């Protein structure tokens, strides 16, 4: 029988590394007589894996009546679908819930269960929530709910087990629930959950407090004279102390963790293939709580992620989304590397949009592998329709611009997926190459919750979507400044890990834990380079005065409250050496101490400090992404990198060419992207090698990405470099793709002559390195080694 393992970034199936190229086909929404055609279209697109949900309420429409063979409806034939996928050579990822989301009635939870046991429903602070909302939230840890889930698993698990890859079937992974996030209510602090099992004396809230704090801790933290845990009620408004609100948030994360553990242990008794989960909490920085819980309880779970940018509107993935995707992949890389599991984007948006521009689709899909995610599943790859009575968001339709439509037609981004999937599953060493940024951004997890809530009780704005994560945020500025970055959790990361970076950027609000402030002090003292903005923390995690970082740096940032209302914020001009009137938004604070490096008029608003073996840049304003003729914001980032001695391994002559270097053992691929879409041309220097030599530049006619090989070797032959993507190297034939230019330059070592198919040689030079320029009318051409 087969074996499913993993190594590095890839799955290992029967001893062979496999890069997952998958697509979601929800068999219960597609006519059964069309399954084979749709699967064949997936294979045509270069896919090797099919992903599907198994909806509880579809297969158990009435309590105790199960159908997995299509006896009551042909689209309930789970067994037939699995056998067909196996016959056609697909791997299968299966997601049996109990909750599947999927824009499906109740997210898969049966109506009969809710009707019979309304006590399982989550409650608001004032009682029950409306019953007719599209996903009625359920109290995860309610014993009645868990008992019902157990009965569902008793029915569906034997079917899944029979078709596991380890039993000769196609299933290589089984997932836990779907995006466990308290039915997406985790984003709102007081929407849920006030179910009696949580709020009653001795309930789950009280239990969690006892496990995490002494009463003395809570007296200090919540500013109350408590004699017993039962006196500490669940918060219901922002009038409560902020530390208590953050604890309420963390308590709900803990309930999710406990629920996931219950499901995992149930699955682990049945399945010997990887058990997976998608985006726990639907948060990012909070993932630390999940990964820590996994380590503490020895849960061997593969954590997947997802990327959505245009939900029910036309596609919108241009350069101003790069910051968010760098950030999300960064924190994801941080955790999955430590967990040792392969990164996989299980829901990479390929549908649920009015239209999807193929160049924007390419930008999203092609940026994921260089950012550490070679395994990509496209959701929803095949469109369908909802059986009557099971619809949720979409009425009858479940074809919202999928690559393969309900009628089997192919939409424009089908070809984009095909090209990338074929490259990622065949290019020599590409999937294993690693991004190794010299810069990191440090994230402090409590800020994430305040941003979600729109919390307004601090001096600094908590609108991190505007100033950090969003289209105009700092992270997009860094990405568009050719500054690849990792993302690290400041509460979890070790000092040695921080010191492995040449520069650390930190966005600070009024408070930061004592431990993190002290860690940043030690980081600078031991030689680290810190950039911190737009203030320095003055309080600790309990909102008690604490300012070890400020005291160590000897820098004072003046106190002035930031504005929240977008109609009331200021537009101000900050200048620096070589920077004349750079636009910044919202309050600009004066900075005293250190060497002034930025000014608002005559007032210093930025300072450079050398301390211990390191340095710090302290800014009293927010840096954001703006594009203009003067390009001041990118120039300011480059200035700060130069000030602190940060040098990338690559340089570009055109700053709109965005580069992500992926390095393997003795070789590299440079992902070179045109994110804006207008034609650009330029040269790249990588570790001292400037390319191209014969052409006058690398041309990128439109939005898109090339994966340029450097030093890729087989035997005595080496691709020294190429200005086209190396798709495949089979025997003596190298297949290249360049869809962004009609001319490509290839440099080979260990070769005297070549034959070109799909193009013609129009220039060349020989010697130790054979260089040729190929003019090719199509995207693909082949170079045969003679």
Curated annotation (Swiss-Prot):
Subcellular localization: Cytoplasm
The reaction(s) this protein catalyses: beta-D-glucosaminyl-(1->4)-N-acetyl-D-glucosamine + H2O = D-glucosamine + N-acetyl-D-glucosamine
Enzyme class: hydrolase
UniProt-annotated binding residues for substrate: 53, 102-103, 178-179, 306, 347, 379
Protein name: Exo-beta-D-glucosaminidase
Family in the record: Belongs to the glycosyl hydrolase 35 family.
Active site: residue positions: 179, 347
Source organism of the structure: Thermococcus kodakarensis (strain ATCC BAA-918 / JCM 12380 / KOD1)
One of the record's GO molecular function terms: 2-acetamido-4-O-(2-amino-2-deoxy-beta-D-glucopyranosyl)-2-deoxy-D-glucose exo-beta-D-glucosaminidase activity
Annotated gene: glmA
Record function comment: Exo-type enzyme that specifically cleaves the non-reducing terminal glycosidic bond of chitooligosaccharides. Catalyzes the hydrolysis of GlcN-GlcNAc to glucosamine (GlcN) and N-acetylglucosamine (GlcNAc). Involved in chitin degradation. Can also hydrolyze reduced chitobiose (GlcN2OH) and chitooligosaccharides of various chain lengths.
This protein's UniProt keywords: Cytoplasm, Glycosidase, Hydrolase
Effect of residue 347 to Q: Loss of activity
Assembly behavior: Homodimer.
pH effect on activity, per entry: Optimum pH is 6.0 (with reduced chitobiose as substrate).
One Gene Ontology term from the biological process aspect of the record: galactose catabolic process
Disulfide bonds: none
Gene Ontology terms: cellular component: beta-galactosidase complex; vacuole
EC number(s) recorded for this UniProt protein: 3.2.1.-
Induction, as annotated: Induced by GlcNAc(2). Also induced, to a lesser extent, by colloidal chitin.
